[in-house]
Amino acid sequence: MLNKLSRLLDEAGISLTDHQKNHLVAYVGMLDKWNKAYNLTSVRDPAEMIVRHILDSIVVAPYLQGQRFIDVGTGPGLPGIPLAIVLPDAHFTLLDSLGKRVRFLRQVQHELKLENITPVQSRVEAYPSEPPFDGVISRAFASLSDMVSWCRHLPGDKGRFYALKGQLPEDEIASLPNNFSVESVEKLRVPQLEGERHLVIIKSNKV
């Protein structure tokens, strides 16, 4: 598994320490183990998890600005845990409403000794935003309009929304509320992953 991850990282042009690689592989091992009982992801093959969960998450890292992020609807910690492993100086709040997912996140935090994540069981609308976050991240969480509507209280004035999408969601972009605009759209390259991947970065047009 470690060799596969190393090959994919080389192909993607991503440089990580051995410690970070080992942590990512250990996380996949835990996800595979817990998935059998908790049904945390539809991906059953650990080798496929490396591509569809690990690489697909960490390719976003170069685009994140700031230190404090919240991953809304994180599920089993995606993309928050892989990002926390590769960005040790940033902090990630991992938010999910399902208790079984948050229990898994806390176990990952304990076993991998990740000090830069905070798993939280809560609905996003009910979660307080003090202090504000630099970035709100989502992967397969909601439409862009729903994301900014439900999470508008979370980022600071200069905070951004980072939405991981497959094909470019042109209809969703066109439907954004007037007080939000797309700052940039980044086409992501994920080795061995079929289909397109995009990162949509949204800012609030606060006066």
From Swiss-Prot:
Alphabetical UniProt keywords: Cytoplasm, Methyltransferase, rRNA processing, S-adenosyl-L-methionine, Transferase
User: Which top-level enzyme class is recorded in the Swiss-Prot or TrEMBL entry?
Assistant: transferase
Per the entry, what this protein does is: Specifically methylates the N7 position of guanine in position 527 of 16S rRNA.
The record's catalysed reaction(s) read: guanosine(527) in 16S rRNA + S-adenosyl-L-methionine = N(7)-methylguanosine(527) in 16S rRNA + S-adenosyl-L-homocysteine
Would you say which domain of life the source belongs to? Bacteria
Decide whether keyword Hydrolase is in the record: no
Asked if rRNA processing is a keyword of the record, the answer is yes
Q: Name one GO molecular function term.
A: rRNA (guanine-N7-)-methyltransferase activity
Whose protein is this, by species? Answer: Salmonella arizonae (strain ATCC BAA-731 / CDC346-86 / RSK2980)
Q: Which family does it belong to?
A: Belongs to the methyltransferase superfamily. RNA methyltransferase RsmG family.
Q: Where in the cell is it found?
A: Cytoplasm
Q: Which GO terms describe its cellular component?
A: cytosol
Q: What name appears for this protein in its UniProt entry?
A: Ribosomal RNA small subunit methyltransferase G
